[in-house]
Design a protein with these regions (language model features):
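Extracytoplasmic/secreted proteins, especially bacterial periplasmic and envelope-associated proteins
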Residues: 70, 91-95, 107, 133-146, ...
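Secreted/periplasmic serine-hydrolase-like ester/acetyl group-modifying domain
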Residues: 123-214, 295-316
C-alpha cells in the first residue's frame, strides 16, 4: 500500500496542471514518505538480507557438527549451515550462487568430505531446487521470499527443527566408535578428485572471491568416510589456493572431542556433545582470524538470542 502511495504521488507530481508551489509541497511529502518507506523496508530486511556473516555448505557431517546458535551465543556470530545428505558439490555451488542473491557472507566454510561424492550431479534446475531447499530460511522477508516459499519442495517437506536451528541437526544419542582414529593410517598417497569436482570447486572459489568472501576448508571427525589419502589431496589444494584447512581427523588435540561419547552412530556422524566441541573451537578460530562483528549487544538481532534460548530450553 505504501508503495502504491509513492507511485500515486509521483504521478501527481508529474501532472502538468499542478502549480509550482503545490509541486514543491508534494515533493517534500514524497521525500518523507520515501524515507519512511525505505527505512521500514530496510529494518524489516536487516535481519535477513545481508545478515549472515558465515555461510557453511556441506553434507550431513556439517549439519551434525556445526551449531550456528552456539556460535551466536559464544561469539555473537551470525551463521547458517546449508547442508544436505550426500550433497553433491554441484549443489554446493548452486547453494552459494542462490544465497549470494540475498546474503553477503564474509566467510564461507566448505565441509570438504562432500568433495568426494561420486553420485551423478543434478542438472541446473535440480540443483537450484535443492539449493533453495537447504537454505530457504535465508530468503525469509527478502525480495525472493514469495518465490521460494511457494516452491512445491518447500511446501511438502517436513523440516522439523532442522531449519529452525539455522541448519543444525540436534541429536543427543550416543553410540561410541570403539576404534577411535584407527581409520587415519598415515600415507603419502592421494585420493583422486573427479574432474567434475575440480571444475565446481574452482567455480565456488572464484565466485566466493568475487564477493570478497574468505573461504575455510573444514573436515569434521568421520570414521566411515574420511581417510588420510583424502586429507592429503585437500591439504595440497589448501596450499595451492591459500585456503586454510582444519582437519579434526588429524588435528585431534584441538578440542576435547572423544569418540566414546561424541558420535550418535558409531563414527559416521557427531552427536550434540561432539558438535559442541567442534563449534566451540570453530567459533574461537573465526573470532581470531576474521573480522567478524559481535552482534550480541545489537538490539536489532534480539531474535537470535531468543532463538538460542528456545533451542537451549528444548534440548534440556
Amino acid at each position: 500500500m505504501t508503495a502504491f502511495i509513492i507511485l500515486f504521488i509521483i504521478g501527481t507530481l508529474h501532472n502538468p496542471n499542478n502549480n509550482s508551489e503545490y509541486n514543491h509541497e508534494n515533493e517534500n511529502q514524497l521525500q518523507k514518505i520515501k524515507h519512511q518507506f525505505n527505512n521500514n523496508k530496510q529494518n524489516k530486511r536487516l535481519l535477513n538480507e545481508n545478515s549472515i556473516d558465515v555461510l557453511a555448505i556441506g553434507n550431513s557431517s556439517l549439519y551434525s557438527a556445526l551449531n550456528p546458535l552456539q556460535l551466536w551465543h559464544e561469539q555473537g556470530i551470525t551463521s547458517y549451515s546449508a547442508a544436505g545428505p550426500s550433497l553433491h558439490i554441484s549443489t554446493s555451488f548452486s547453494i552459494l550462487k542462490e544465497c549470494l542473491t540475498v546474503q553477503r557472507p564474509k566467510v564461507l566454510i566448505l565441509e570438504v568430505s562432500n568433495f568426494f561424492e561420486t553420485k551423478k550431479a543434478g542438472n541446473m534446475a535440480q540443483n537450484k531446487v535443492l539449493a533453495l531447499k537447504y537454505s530457504y530460511p535465508l530468503f525469509e522477508e527478502t525480495q525472493r521470499w514469495n518465490e521460494v516459499k511457494n516452491l512445491p519442495i518447500i511446501k511438502r517437506t517436513d523440516f522439523g527443527n532442522h531449519m529452525y536451528y539455522k541448519g543444525y541437526y540436534y541429536n543427543n544419542k550416543v553410540k561410541a566408535n570403539q576404534n577411535q582414529y584407527s581409520y587415519m593410517k598415515p600415507t603419502d598417497a592421494r585420493e583422486k578428485l573427479l574432474t567434475e569436482t575440480k571444475i565446481y570447486l574452482l567455480q565456488i572459489i572464484k565466485l566466493a572471491r568475487e564477493y570478497n568472501c574468505q573461504i575455510l576448508f573444514v573436515c569434521f571427525p568421520c570414521s566411515t568416510a574420511w581417510t588420510y589419502k583424502k586429507h592429503n589431496i585437500i591439504n595440497d589444494i589448501s596450499k595451492m589456493t591459500k585456503i586454510p584447512f582444519i582437519d579434526f581427523n588429524t588435528e585431534t588435540l584441538l578440542t576435547n572431542f572423544n569418540w566414546k561419547n561424541g558420535t550418535r552412530d558409531g563414527g559416521d556422524h557427531l552427536n550434540a556433545t561432539g558438535a559442541y566441541e567442534m563449534t566451540k573451537y570453530l567459533g574461537e578460530y573465526l573470532n581470531q582470524h576474521y573480522s567478524l562483528e559481535d552482534y550480541r549487544q545489537n538490539k536489532l538481532f534480539v531474535k537470535w538470542e531468543r532463538l538460542y534460548q528456545s533451542f537451549n530450553s528444548k534440548k534440556n
